[in-house]
Design a protein with these regions (language model features):
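Aromatic-lined substrate-binding rim segments of carbohydrate-active enzymes
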Residues: 61-64, 78-132, 248
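Active-site mouth loops of central-metabolism enzymes
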Residues: 43-59, 145-159, 334-344
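N-terminal substrate-binding region of glycoside hydrolase catalytic domains
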Residues: 32-96
Length: 696
């Protein structure tokens, strides 16, 4: 990447009472628009217990007024439970909301409706939910979810049409479609495999299947046969959601052509991850604004590593959105809303972390679902109010610019590779490899287009064409031994530099060789106890004289049992390759291994990594591509210990950076020297679970 042009950003505080001075959605749904944002998009999602009662509703608005600026938007859920409402019950809610929204506008907020169930989430409150001649969401084994319905059912489509017609006629400022519009539903797992869906698939492909026959064909046969059928089913899933969105868009925009529509998502691999196309459909012929709410898990702070994990999930989702979608509000979820389940500081950090990963704001679903006073929630509201200026500064500085750094390879077809050699495809799970590499200070990226180094894992390589694979191998690549075997089998051996000789499942320890990338850690050992954490240790053999060994294997007597388990190679395409055969995805958190990995990834990138944390700290880092001659990045101390003397290596000629803490306190830091293309900046201290924003 090009060297970063010197730029000193001047921040000025903008009153929190005004809405962002941009459209709420899309100007043109393409990848060229880069709308300037001056503050974050923030909203609160409000349950029916807080708006059906006049007393509770007034108290809610008074609380928001007390902390004016904590939110710009107040969004109302249509109901509380997760199966679809009857039309009569839905109309009663909407009639109340029409009045409530007028009161909200009178207080100076934008307001809209979040339709909790379009097709339904799962089995809950079934006795008081929608019943009738509708087809339930059906699993591959023929089991059904009684709380969710097939969106291809004609009767359900008429129900949905009336649902969105009533909602639009209530005159909200916007409408949100919730994440029940997906194809994974409890208790069946993935659907829909009802008889009607099989008939639609037959029309799409010309192939007729029973459920049993389809399941067998998806899991048996040659690799190419399975990949072809699975890819066709993913397209069928994309089409199913596209048809639903055509119905919603036409219903809404027939009444109000300019009505903004928003959609909430998670990782949608089985659905085909067709966000760009779905967004264009929702915009309609008049190109109405489209909003997005990427989400995932992390409902409490019991497992704090889930915070960054959710940011990575969200970053993937944002990476495929058209740039013209500017209102990208992360889902901040504290379900079931028990205040001690997630600390206020963690809620603030979560919103900040998701902004760092690509969002432009946050939608807070954090308040009570009971008809009770909000006294226990006021400290959380106050803490979010204090943090609003930091959210604004982050969005102003980062905008919708692309992340650059290390990408874990995936694409819209990645789900076709799950359980490719054995097992049930439909239950394969997330196709993207999970790893610790992003926790040691390497910059996370979610797009192959903007990656400086690419991580290959699982069977994901089968989702790419041979031309795409060759292009990937012409750049920096880190892979495990299983991927090496796949690539060599596919005919790419001349570009990988190694082959697998054998694997062993017990009593193997990695030992670092003498090599410049290992620095002073030659001879260090890494024992990840295969008897506890099961993972094969692979022995690699060089297939090219230019390969270099970074580590071998020893046993518990110290005897060498493998000359090479990790090595590097530069191929004739100019690509730099690292193959890791010993715990390639985990146990990176000691000094020697984390230092080695940073050296390796810098080497793989040919010094094109935009930044990394060189010091020994548990850090998550996000760096944006330069925009208008400036760069911005954010990092989190993802530890319960203070991080002292954090060393940020930044590819720039600038010798001065501005560092902002989460109270927007600015510190100017001078470079402590340079290393090649990188300047070295030392941040004195970062408290536990705190973020820093860096601007230059």
């Amino acid at each position: 990447m090009n060297k970063i042009i010197i730029f000193i950003s001047i921040f000025f505080f903008i009153s929190c009472t005004n809405s962002p001075k941009t459209k709420t959605g899309s100007e043109e749904l393409d990848d060229t628009t880069n709308t300037k944002l001056d503050r974050a998009f923030t909203s609160f999602r409000i349950g029916e217990a807080q708006y059906l009662s006049e007393k509770r509703f007034t108290e809610l608005l008074d609380l928001f007024d007390k902390y004016k600026g904590v939110t710009d938007e107040i969004t109302f859920f249509t109901h509380t439970t997760h199966a679809p409402l009857t039309l009569d019950d839905f109309r009663q809610r909407v009639d109340v909301l029409k009045l409530r929204m007028e009161e909200v506008r009178n207080r100076g907020y934008r307001t809209g409706i979040n339709i909790l169930t379009t097709i339904g989430h799962h089995n809950e409150n079934l006795d008081n939910s929608l019943k009738g001649d509708y087809t339930n969401m059906t699993g591959i084994e023929g089991d059904v979810s009684h709380g969710s319905y097939c969106p291809n059912n004609k009767n359900l489509q008429e129900y949905i049409r009336q649902l969105y017609q009533m909602t639009t006629e209530a005159n909200p400022d916007y409408i949100w479609i919730d994440d029940d519009v997906r194809l994974g539903h409890m208790p069946i797992g993935y659907g829909c495999f009802c008889d009607n869906c099989l008939k639609i698939f037959e029309k799409e492909t010309g192939a007729r299947y029973s459920r049993e026959g389809l399941n067998k064909a998806m899991n048996e046969g040659t690799v190419d046969e399975k990949l072809k059928l699975r890819k066709e089913w993913l397209q069928h899933n994309r089409n199913t959601i596209a048809r639903l969105f055509v119905l919603i868009e036409e219903t809404v925009h027939k009444i109000n052509p300019d009505m903004p529509l928003g959609f909430m998502t998670g990782d949608r691999f089985f659905e085909g991850y067709d966000f760009g196309n779905w967004a264009k459909i929702l915009a309609g012929p008049n190109n109405a604004p489209v909003m997005w709410r990427p989400g995932g898990g992390f409902y409490n702070d019991v497992n704090t590593s889930g915070l960054a994990g959710k940011s990575h999930d969200i970053g993937r989702q944002v990476s495929v959105l058209p740039k013209a979608i500017v209102s990208v509000q992360s889902e901040i979820e504290c379900f079931p809303y028990q205040r001690l389940k997630k600390a206020a500081n963690i809620v603030v950090l979560e919103a900040s972390s998701h902004i760092a990963a690509g969002c432009t704001g946050a939608a807070f679903n954090v308040l009570s679902m009971y008809d009770e006073p909000l006294d226990e929630y006021e400290p959380l509201i106050a803490r979010l109010h204090e943090s609003r200026q930091f959210f604004d500064l982050m969005v102003k500085s980062l905008g919708r610019s692309a992340l650059t750094g290390v990408n874990t390879l995936w694409n819209k077809d990645s789900y076709i590779t799950g359980n490719l050699n054995n097992g049930n495809w439909v239950s394969a799970g997330n196709p993207v490899i999970g790893h610790d590499i992003y926790n040691i200070g390497l910059p996370a990226c979610y797009s192959n287009q903007h990656a400086e180094v690419t991580i290959l894992g699982k069977d994901n390589i089968y989702a790419f064409s041979k031309e795409e694979i060759k292009e990937i191998l012409s750049r920096g690549v880190y892979m495990d031994a299983e991927t090496l075997q796949y690539l060599n089998k596919m005919g790419f051996g001349e570009f990988t530099g190694f082959e697998v000789v054998k694997s062993e499942n017990v009593d193997r320890i990695e030992k670092f060789s003498t090599h410049p990338l290992n620095g002073n850690f030659a001879g260090r050992e890494r024992d990840n106890r295969q008897s506890f954490w099961k993972s094969s240790a692979y022995t690699l053999r060089k297939t090219n004289e230019n390969t270099q060994v970074l580590s071998g294997l020893i046993d518990y007597t110290g005897t060498k049992v493998s000359d090479c388990t990790m090595g590097v190679f530069e191929n004739k395409l100019g690509g730099r390759i690292c193959v890791a055969g010993y715990y390639p995805w985990s146990f990176m958190e000691n000094l020697s291994k984390s230092s080695q990995m940073k050296s390796v990834f810098r080497w793989l990138s040919k010094d094109s990594l935009p930044a990394y944390i060189a010091s020994f700290h548990k850090m998550n880092l996000w760096v944006r591509e330069p925009q208008d001659g400036k760069i911005a990045l954010a990092f989190t101390n993802s530890s319960f210990d203070p991080a002292k003397d954090v060393t940020l290596m930044l590819q720039t000629e600038n010798t001065k950076i501005k560092v902002y803490d989460m109270n927007c306190k600015e510190t100017i830091i001078q470079s402590s020297g340079e290393n090649g293309l990188y300047q070295k900046f030392i941040i004195p201290e970062v408290d536990p679970w705190q973020m820093r924003l860096v601007i230059l």
